[in-house]
Amino acid sequence: MANHDQQTVSSAAATTSASPSPVVLPKTSENEQLLRIRHSMSHVMAMAVQQLFPNARVTIGPWTESGFYYDFDNPEPFTEADLKAIKKGMIKIINKKLPLERVEVSRSEAEEKIKAQNEPYKLEILEGLQEPITLYTLGEDWWDLCAGPHVENTGQLNAKAFELESVAGAYWRGDETKAQLQRIYGTAWETAEQLAEHKRRKEEALRRDHRRIGKDLDLFSIEDEAGAGLVFWHPRGARMRLLIEEFWRQAHFEGGYELLYTPHVADISLWKTSGHLDFYAESMFGPMEVDEREYQLKPMNCPFHVLTYASKLRSYRELPIRWAELGTVYRYERPGVMHGLMRVRGFTQDDAHVFCLPEQISDEILKILDLTERILSTFDFNTYEINLSTRPEKSIGDDAVWDLATKGLIEALERKGWAYKIDEGGGAFYGPKIDLKIEDAIGRMWQCSTIQLDFNLPERFKLDYIAADGSKQRPIMIHRAIFGSLERFFGIMTENYAGDYPLWLAPEQVRLLPVTDEVQPYAESLLDQLTQAGVRATIDRSGDRLGKLIRTGEQMKIPVLAVIGAKEAEQNAVSLRSRRDGDLGVVAVADLLRAAQNANSQRAAGLELN
C-alpha cells in the first residue's frame, strides 16, 4: 500500500513525540563537526538545567536538522526567565572547557549509576540497550547514556553561536498516555555569523508562515468547534483550490489518464483484505456500525482503485491503464503533530495508479516524471532532490520482478536526465520507490512527490489480466502522487510565494478603486466586463481615500490595482498599479482585458501589456 505521508512540522506551541527528530547525516567533516557541536550542546544544556533545577529528570537529547533539544520532567513549567538562566549556566560550562569522555560500562554498572541519580527514564532506556553500555561524562559531576559523537571538550563550543529558542510539550515515548515532558529547543553553530544567518532565515520563514498568510488573506481556517485537523476553505481559498484542481485535471487528461471518484468509507472487510488493519490501524479512525455492518473512513485511495480494476475482466491489450483521483482521505494524527495545512486529519491526495505490463515500467515511470515536472514547474518549483529506494531485507515479491522494477525506475530517471541518490534497502516491503523533494524560495526542501511500485495489493486482491498466450498474469501496479496532499502542497506553495501568488492563481486578480461616487457606475460596468472575460475582479466600495484604498489592496496582496477617476472614465481606461511591475500608467480597458485573459490562459505571473 502506498503511504504518501504528510510532512511532520514541529511547532513550539505543540505537544510532540519524545523521540529524535530527523537529522542531517554527516556527509563531510564540516557537517560532522556541526553535529558534534549540537549533540554536545544538548548535554551542556541538560547539565545546566539540572544544576539550576535539581528535581528535573532527564530523558533524551538529540541533535536536529537546525539545532538540538532535550526533554525534561520538571515539576514546574520552564519560563522565558528560566531559559535566560539556563543559557547563562551553559556559557559557564562552556568556558570551563570541561572534557566530554566516552566510557563503556556493564549493564549492572549503568543500572547502579542511574538508580543512584534517580533517573527513571534513563532506566527505561537502558532496558532496550545491549552491552557494552556507553556513557559520556561531562566533567566530573555529570554524565548521560549516549553513543556519541561529541566534541572533545566544551571549549570547542562557541558561546556566541548558540541560542535557546523555545519550550514545547512532549510525551514520553510519543505516547499520550505517558508522562508529559517539557522540551527545550536550541540551535548551535560554529560561528556567530552562522547563528545570525539562521535567525534571519527563521524570521523569513515566520514571515512566510502559511497559517498567518491564510488568515490575513482569508483563504482557510481550522475551526475548533468542528475538530482539530479539519480544513475549512473560505471563498478566496476555494477559488485557488479550484484553479489548481482544474489545471491538475487538464494535465492528467492530456497525459492519458482517466479520472475516478470513489467512496469515502468502506466495509471493514476491505481494510482487512488490503492489509490496512494489520499495518495501519493506528492511523485510521475507528469503525462505525451501519445496518449491522462495520465501516471505516478511508486512509488511502489505493484499495478503491484496485476494486475498480477488478470489476471486470482485463486484457493485456488494455494496458497500461492510468487512473487518477483527487480523493479525500482521513487519518488519525496525534494533536502534537498537526500543523496548519501541513499535517491534518482530512486531506485530499492526488492519487494515481497505473496498471501495466512488466516491459512497460520504464516508459510509464518516464511519463510520470514528465507529468510531475510539468505540474510542479507551473507553481515555480524547479529544483528537485530525488531518492531511489531499493529492496529491503524483508520484502515480498519475485526477485526477477524486483530487479525489473528497480531497473525500470533507474532507466526512467536516466532517460529523464535527473540526478538521483540511491537509498539501498530503503524501499517499502512491497516495492521500490522514487521520492522527490522540492526546494522553496528560501532553500528549504519539502517532501512532495512519490512514485511507488506495489507487488502487494495486486497479490492480495488477486488482480490479473489475460496475457497474449491466454494465461492469467498479475499486472504491475504503480502508485503515484505529485502534490501528495493538496492541502499540504497549498501550504508549501503559499510559503514559497509568501502569499504573493502569480496573477493566474491569485484569488482576486484585479481590484477596482473608484475615487469618487460619480465614477461608480463606470466601475460597476467594468467589473461586469472583467467578470464576463473570466477575470477575478472586485470593487472596493468602502469610500475611503485613495491612499487607504491602495494600502488595503497592497495588504491583501492584490496583483493589480485599477484606479478609476473622472479622466479614466472618460477615456474608457484605468490607471494600473502592479505588485510585480509597479506603476503601469493609464491603460485602455480593452488592453487590460486582453492582457488578463492571456495571463490566465498562459498561467502567467503578471500582466504583459505590450
Curated annotation (Swiss-Prot):
InterPro entries: aa-tRNA-synt_IIb, aa-tRNA-synth_II, aa-tRNA-synth_II/BPL/LPL, Anticodon-bd, Anticodon-bd_dom_sf, Thr-tRNA-ligase_IIa, Thr/Ala-tRNA-synth_IIc_edit, ThrRS_anticodon. One of its GO terms (molecular function) is ATP binding. Residues 8-24 have a biased composition (Low complexity). The keyword Thylakoid does not apply. GO terms for cellular component: cytoplasm. Disulfide bonds: none annotated. It is found in: Cytoplasm. Keywords: Aminoacyl-tRNA synthetase, ATP-binding, Cytoplasm, Ligase, Metal-binding, Nucleotide-binding, Protein biosynthesis, RNA-binding, tRNA-binding, Zinc. Homodimer. Belongs to the class-II aminoacyl-tRNA synthetase family. Catalyzes the attachment of threonine to tRNA(Thr) in a two-step reaction: L-threonine is first activated by ATP to form Thr-AMP and then transferred to the acceptor end of tRNA(Thr). Also edits incorrectly charged L-seryl-tRNA(Thr). This is Threonine--tRNA ligase.
